[in-house]
């Protein structure tokens, strides 16, 4: 039942006026210290635009504004406003490492935003419905952080109402789409989210996944995971 409610919040937020949606959308194309990307800021901008048609609580961080401190502080402050019946959404498109997500000012693995930190922020939020869309290399690490010191913090138990949409497994890299405005993962994610009320979580993932496989020869299968 909670899964159905959560999908309605994703696809039909205008039908649930009593529920407030809080969104933090992050995209980084030009990094301070590591190699640049092309479409990631477009990804975050388009995801923010999609949710702005349904809520005023959308924060967009791109480029040099998406520092480590800024991302963590924004997630904490924005999601702290949510009540139990609300929905929080975190979208990230950029570089990822096996230890976490790379902010604008990330220099190496020790300065990334660890999966444990992200999970701690999400788990501390009062909202019962939490969505994470991660378009980055090694995104699967968010499910099970490889760092033993924070693995307990980064795992999501089944009571937390968290749904993860991840572009890669723990040991996989992601690739940008050589054509168009958006990366491959985000392109089909956006298309799926705009697809109408009849789509389910499984159908949404199958639609995006089958399209990706049809358009490319990438030796990987992006992952969807629900702890609902």
Predicted segments with their positions:
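Active-site glycine/GP-rich loop and adjacent strand/helix microenvironment
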Residues: 10
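Cysteine endopeptidase catalytic domains of the caspase/legumain-like
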Residues: 2, 7, 16-228
